[in-house]
Amino acid sequence: MAFLIMSSAAAVATGTNAAQASMIAPFTGLKSATSFPVSRKQNLDITSIASNGGRVQCMQVWPPINKKKYETLSYLPDLSEEQLLREVEYLLKNGWVPCLEFETEHGFVYRENNKSPGYYDGRYWTMWKLPMFGCTDATQVLAEVEEAKKAYPQAWIRIIGFDNVRQVQCISFIAYKPEGY
């Protein structure tokens, strides 16, 4: 029995010596700054300065009068048919499910059910038919947009990309606005 205890203690002692032999040297600090080149080119470019004071003069304020906000990038010009097609192809390429929604009264952001600021603004859009599960052709989605435009010419229509694995909406953009907006 004593032999058994001795041999296990000896095995532990030899195991620690092997571990200590393969240890990495401890951190000794940073190298001396004298080994790095000191000459620097003076940068006079205004965009590299930490302050944005020089850029303030070229900024413009978004005019809020008669400029309703629809979605995140609603300040951009309307998408052309080709741009819509490319957006839907991007949506499909990422494996998201295209859905169409429309709103007949308030296509822009407003507060109705909740008065706090933030993402939730009280809008509920009506879904056009069912989500297009299994859709692989962007032209099918645009054909549905055309059908929705014929049925509701005075409605806002948006396309949503829904990730059915993560259960989240990944993309949303306005595909059609009524005349005058």
Curated annotation (Swiss-Prot):
Q: How does it assemble?
A: Heterohexadecamer of 8 large and 8 small subunits.
Organism for this UniProt entry: Nicotiana sylvestris
More info: The basic functional RuBisCO is composed of a large chain homodimer in a 'head-to-tail' conformation. In form I RuBisCO this homodimer is arranged in a barrel-like tetramer with the small subunits forming a tetrameric 'cap' on each end of the 'barrel'.
Q: Which Gene3D superfamilies match?
A: Ribulose bisphosphate carboxylase, small subunit (3.30.190.10)
Q: Does the keyword Phosphoprotein apply?
A: no
The protein's name: Ribulose bisphosphate carboxylase small subunit, chloroplastic 2
Query: What family is this?
Result: Belongs to the RuBisCO small chain family.
Which CDD domains does the UniProt record give?
RuBisCO_small
Biological processes per GO annotation: photorespiration; reductive pentose-phosphate cycle
The places in or outside the cell where this protein is found are: Plastid, Chloroplast
